[in-house]
From Swiss-Prot:
Domain C-type lysozyme span(s) in chain numbering: 19-148
Active site: 53, 71
PROSITE patterns named in the record: GLYCOSYL_HYDROL_F22_1 (PS00128), GLYCOSYL_HYDROL_F22_2 (PS51348)
Residue pairs linked by disulfide bridges in the UniProt entry: 24-146, 48-134, 83-99, 95-113
Reaction(s) this enzyme catalyzes, per UniProt: Hydrolysis of (1->4)-beta-linkages between N-acetylmuramic acid and N-acetyl-D-glucosamine residues in a peptidoglycan and between N-acetyl-D-glucosamine residues in chitodextrins
Organism of provenance: Pongo pygmaeus
This protein's name: Lysozyme C
Length: 148
């Protein structure tokens, strides 16, 4: 019985751990997934966005009480428009995926959804953190020394 309790605690701790990317590790991953120059957006801008939205944390979430939506994952993609979390009223799910897919350590789904977001007229300006922290700023520091 004691072994089952310990096993349960170990499994629980594994499921709640998140991956927080190192800066250059994320830069290389985003480059490999085709983000550098996607829709004219530099890799440095994507890195700045991820830094200020999630701190490079794949499991970051942020509840928005005003519209009862939640932002998910490394890019803080919103459940009102882009994914289905089963609890956001009037959700659109334009990325056609579960919001839990945006919380995975493998960020391929998050990248695919971010690419979908920037195909809309707002582009990268859809992210408030990008507008406040990255727009019209020198963002080269986010990829400096990463060899990308």
């Amino acid at each position: 019985m004691k072994a089952l309790i310990i096993l349960g605690l170990v499994l629980l701790s594994v499921t709640v751990q998140s991956k927080v990317f190192e800066r250059c590790e994320l830069a290389r991953t985003l480059k490999r997934l085709g983000m550098d120059g996607y829709r004219g957006i530099s890799l440095a801008n994507w890195m700045c966005l991820a830094k200020w939205e999630s701190g490079y944390n794949t499991r970051a979430t942020n509840y928005n009480p005003g519209d009862r939506s939640t932002d998910y994952g490394i890019f803080q993609i919103n459940s009102r428009y882009w994914c289905n979390d089963g609890k956001t009223p009037g959700a659109v799910n334009a990325c056609h995926l579960s919001c839990s897919a945006l919380l995975q350590d493998n960020i391929a789904d998050a990248v695919a959804c971010a690419k979908r977001v920037v195909r809309d007229p707002q582009g990268i300006r859809a992210w408030v953190a990008w507008r406040n922290r990255c727009q019209n700023r020198d963002v080269r520091q986010y990829v400096q020394g990463c060899g990308v």
